[in-house]
């Protein structure tokens, strides 16, 4: 009878046991390896997907490159932030002069003398082709000295400014500016010597004035429109009108009622020149504007010789400049 020698058979048994375990556990091991394959394959789709965002980012950069030069710095957006003159050149303001400017969005202080009027010099971009290209390369500040009575301008074919010097005490007009280096609009201004203004006894004023209302519309903010203005005062109250310069087509009625130094412009034309916006023409129209008037003494010491004021809304804005005309009785 042979006995099972466990000591001699133990190595063989263990070897068989290990083999059996390896074979039986192979399914688990293969499953584990099968689950790991997707992990090894992940980089392929990731790399493929990553290529697309990279291309999209480059496209966005290309699209955003043109506006880069128009990023509003303190100097570029200064006027529209109402701080251009004050931030860049506060020392050019005059404590002896008073004035205002009006644009499509703002009414600002404009206390510059006739010897240093704040304007902009716009330089166009000759290479602008696409709508995303900036139309302007730069807009530098220029201070203008008004030496000639009447209109002063730098370029008749495309002026950066047109300023009308009535006399040594008063001027009005406009200069061009741009907020985004693409769109240009006219900024309407006036200025006068503080000690030349009269605010007394205007309730007794009887006089006739003629001049112009210089304005732009939201449709074409860079195109100046000149309207002929007439305003006749009698005992502090006044009526008048503004006509289109070339056709005498009435654009506005002017009323001065309770306050002699405040005028109401009420549109009577459904469409203003250069505009495709419909105006509400009824009395007390929501499209009317209020203009504070300033009565200025002439250089010849004639009281209330000139009137200036500015006003506007989202459809139109401009400046009013008038001069007293002698009546037959005064002659």
Swiss-Prot record:
Record keywords: Cell outer membrane, Lipoprotein, Membrane, Palmitate, Signal
Lipid moiety-binding residues (N-palmitoyl cysteine): 21
Lipid modification (S-diacylglycerol cysteine), residues: 21
Subcellular location: Cell outer membrane; Cell surface
Keyword Lipoprotein: yes
Record's GO cellular component terms: cell outer membrane; cell surface
Name of the featured protein: Outer membrane lipoprotein PM1514
Protein source organism: Pasteurella multocida (strain Pm70)
Phylogenetic lineage: Bacteria, Pseudomonadati, Pseudomonadota, Gammaproteobacteria, Pasteurellales
């Amino acid at each position: 009878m042979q006995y099972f020698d466990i000591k001699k058979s133990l190595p063989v048994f263990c070897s068989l046991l290990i083999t059996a375990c390896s074979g039986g556990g192979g399914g688990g091991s293969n499953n584990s390896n099968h689950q790991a394959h997707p992990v090894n394959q992940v980089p392929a789709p990731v790399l493929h997907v990553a290529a697309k965002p990279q291309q999209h980012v480059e496209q966005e950069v290309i699209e955003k490159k043109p506006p880069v030069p128009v990023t509003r710095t303190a100097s570029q957006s200064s006027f529209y932030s109402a701080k251009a003159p004050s931030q860049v050149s506060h020392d050019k303001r005059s404590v002896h002069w008073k004035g205002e400017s009006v644009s499509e969005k703002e009414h600002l202080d404009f206390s510059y003398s006739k010897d240093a009027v704040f304007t902009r010099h716009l330089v166009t971009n000759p290479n602008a082709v696409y709508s995303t290209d900036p139309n302007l390369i730069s807009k530098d500040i220029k201070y203008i000295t008004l030496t000639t009575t009447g209109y002063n301008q730098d370029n008749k074919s495309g002026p950066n400014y047109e300023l009308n010097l009535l006399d040594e005490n008063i001027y009005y007009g406009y200069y061009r500016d741009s907020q985004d280096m693409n769109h240009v609009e006219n900024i309407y201004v006036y200025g006068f010597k503080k000690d030349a203004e009269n605010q007394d006894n205007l309730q007794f004023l009887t006089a006739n004035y003629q001049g112009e209302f210089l304005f732009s519309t939201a449709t074409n903010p860079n195109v100046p429109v000149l309207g002929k203005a007439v305003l006749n005062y009698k005992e502090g109250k006044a009526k008048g009108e503004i006509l289109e310069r070339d056709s005498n087509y009435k654009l506005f009625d002017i009323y001065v009622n309770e306050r002699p130094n405040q005028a109401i412009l009420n549109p009577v034309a459904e469409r203003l020149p250069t505009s495709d916006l419909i105006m509400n023409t009824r009395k007390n129209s929501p499209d009317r504007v209020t203009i504070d008037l300033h009565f200025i003494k002439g250089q010849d010491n004639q009281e209330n010789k000139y009137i200036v004021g500015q006003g506007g809304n989202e459809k139109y804005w401009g400046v009013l400049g008038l001069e007293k005309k002698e009546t037959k009785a005064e002659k």
